[in-house]
Curated annotation (Swiss-Prot):
Motif position, Nuclear localization signal (NLS) 2: 178-184
Residue spans of biased composition, Acidic residues class: 187-215
Annotated segments matching region Binding to AGER/RAGE: 150-183
Outcome (variant: residue 39 to A): Greatly reduces phosphorylation, nuclear localization
Record-given protein name: High mobility group protein B1
Chief site of localization: nucleus
Assigned protein family: Belongs to the HMGB family.
Protein species of origin: Homo sapiens (Human)
GO MF assignments: bubble DNA binding; C-X-C chemokine binding; calcium-dependent protein kinase regulator activity; chemoattractant activity; cytokine activity; damaged DNA binding; DNA binding, bending; DNA polymerase binding
Induction of its expression: (Microbial infection) Protein levels increase upon infection by human coronavirus SARS-CoV-2.
Subunit structure: Interacts (fully reduced HMGB1) with CXCL12; probably in a 1:2 ratio involving two molecules of CXCL12, each interacting with one HMG box of HMGB1; inhibited by glycyrrhizin. Associates with the TLR4:LY96 receptor complex. Component of the RAG complex composed of core components RAG1 and RAG2, and associated component HMGB1 or HMGB2. Interacts (in cytoplasm upon starvation) with BECN1; inhibits the interaction of BECN1 and BCL2 leading to promotion of autophagy. Interacts with KPNA1; involved in nuclear import. Interacts with SREBF1, TLR2, TLR4, TLR9, PTPRZ1, APEX1, FEN1, POLB, TERT. (Microbial infection) Interacts with adenovirus protein pVII; this interaction immobilizes HMGB1 on chromatin, thus preventing its release from cell and subsequent inflammation activation.
């Protein structure tokens, strides 16, 4: 998204960001002419935040929730300037894309591989899963493929209902056009499915990496 686009929605703020903003405003009122040492100020804010009770943090969390809702609402109607691509905004209420047969297979066998080879990196685990899937017989793949097909069928029904609910007038007007472009749309959605699955696997791997770091 364009850095200089004035119509671009302001990014959502976290509860801690709202807290720091409040601290900054308080500091300006008390010391209007004093310059702020950013690193020292940040350190003091961080220490103060750690000692605050959940009740005290509550108002900042409410502010963050309200700002998140504002951001999501504005992003739905935001159109980036021509020639500029924007990352697709994902509505949290939209039906989630179904996993592929391979993704279901990975979900089942990933914990087993990590248990047997605790020293393996995320990349090596993914590589091993790929090798296992390629060496799995077609008959053994069927349960995953059947489950994936059922989940995809359910998703298609859910997304159709979701889209119809969101744009009833557009759905009525575009019946003829939709029929013509149905095949193309399905192909695009299949490509999106693959992209989203890769994103989901990346996110899952990142989460696992963070968990490993915490341990």
């Amino acid at each position: 998204m364009g850095k200089g686009d004035p119509k671009k929605p302001r990014g959502k703020m976290s509860s801690y960001a709202f807290f720091v903003q409040t601290c900054r405003e308080e500091h300006k009122k008390k010391h209007p002419d004093a310059s702020v040492n950013f690193s020292e100020f940040s350190k003091k804010c961080s220490e103060r935040w750690k000692t605050m009770s959940a009740k005290e943090k509550g108002k900042f969390e409410d502010m963050a929730k309200a700002d998140k809702a504002r951001y999501e609402r504005e992003m739905k109607t935001y159109i980036p300037p021509k020639g500029e691509t924007k990352k697709k905004f994902k509505d949290p209420n939209a039906p989630k894309r179904p996993p592929s047969a391979f993704f279901l297979f990975c979900s089942e066998y990933r914990p087993k591989i990590k248990g047997e080879h605790p020293g393996l990196s995320i990349g090596d685990v993914a590589k091993k899963l790929g090798e296992m899937w390629n060496n799995t017989a077609a008959d053994d793949k069927q349960p995953y493929e059947k489950k994936a097909a059922k989940l995809k069928e359910k998703y298609e029904k859910d997304i159709a209902a979701y889209r119809a609910k969101g744009k009833p007038d557009a759905a009525k007007k575009g019946v003829v056009k939709a029929e013509k472009s149905k095949k193309k749309k399905e192909e695009e959605e299949d490509e999106e499915d693959e992209e989203d699955e890769e994103e989901e696997e990346d996110e899952e791997d990142e989460d696992e990496e963070e968990d490993d770091d915490d341990e």
